[in-house]
Amino acid sequence: MTIGTPEAAAKAVDFYADQGATSFKAYTNLTRAELGAAIQAAHRRGLKVTGHLCSVTLREAADLGIDDIEHGFMAASDFKANKQPDLCPGGGTSEAELAADPAKADALLDYLVQKKVAYTSTLAVRDTARNSPGIEVYAPDVRALFENNRRQPKSSPDAPMPSGLKQLVGFAKAFYDKGGLLLVGTDPTGGGGVVPGFANHTEIENLVQGGFRFEEAIKASTLNGAAYLGRAEKIGTVAAGKQADLVLIAGDPSTDVRDVRKVEIVFKEGVGYDPKKLIDAVRGKAGLY
């Protein structure tokens, strides 16, 4: 929804909350006043706001009370030279821009932790040259869109982690080690070559390859999301009295993280499902609806 004033931002939050919306995502071109009004309106209802930001820096958003930032430092405008207030300078943050001032990056991570802003990593979108698992479920035209617009020449899952991706994992690890609430997400779907579910495995692999212990990567992928949603007492870990969906894996991903893909059975609400049959049922259809 396009917003033009702080009043319209607050009104939009109230309208969609009345329809049952439980959280909100701000996008690139909101002003600080508009974002602040949306956050205040959401918080009055006990709801949260996340954001893929640009016109507003991460530090500014933290001051406004945002609950989460999407894509970590990937979309941050804090490192853009001559950034103008309330204007998006365009383009993602480059590897060189992030590397130019390590002290500034570290201080920003500290600030996000201090302000209790969660940090959602979406690493798989930067790893489609090495890893694009699950694209066989795409409709042919959607798959062609991705393969024709692949950001980098296709490589192998065994290829070294690209330097830009390694840098982003490093920021996620630093945030996690500082006590920040790191969340795991995937972005984008469709022509971006990132397939939900499959890409969650890629996220876990990226974290482990970038220095996380396997247990830390799993925590970021499960319990931390539940904690952010305020549901950690019910979901997020396997414990007596909690609700838990489970997977049976033919391997040991704590030894070889790539074994996380070897899923034999998925248990959802106590019922076991064959993942191969589920995938075959949607093969060639994803993206049609």
Predicted regions, residues:
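Active-site mouth loops of central-metabolism enzymes
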Residues: M1-A8
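Active-site neighborhoods of metal-dependent hydrolases
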Residues: A12-L30, A75-G210, R283-Y289
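Divalent metal-coordination and catalytic microenvironments
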Residues: G20, A42, I69, Y119, ...
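Surface-exposed amphipathic alpha-helices with a cationic face
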Residues: L35-G46, V113, K173-D177
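Glycine-enriched alpha-helix->loop->beta-strand junction motifs that scaffold or abut catalytic
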Residues: R44-G46, L64-E70, K115-K116, G179
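Short, acidic/turn-prone active-site loops that include or flank metal/cofactor-
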Residues: S55, G72-F79, V271
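Acidic, glycine-enriched loop/beta-strand segments at the rims
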Residues: V195, R213-I218, A227-V263
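Extracellular/periplasmic ectodomains of large secreted or surface enzymes and adhesion receptors
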Residues: E269-Y289
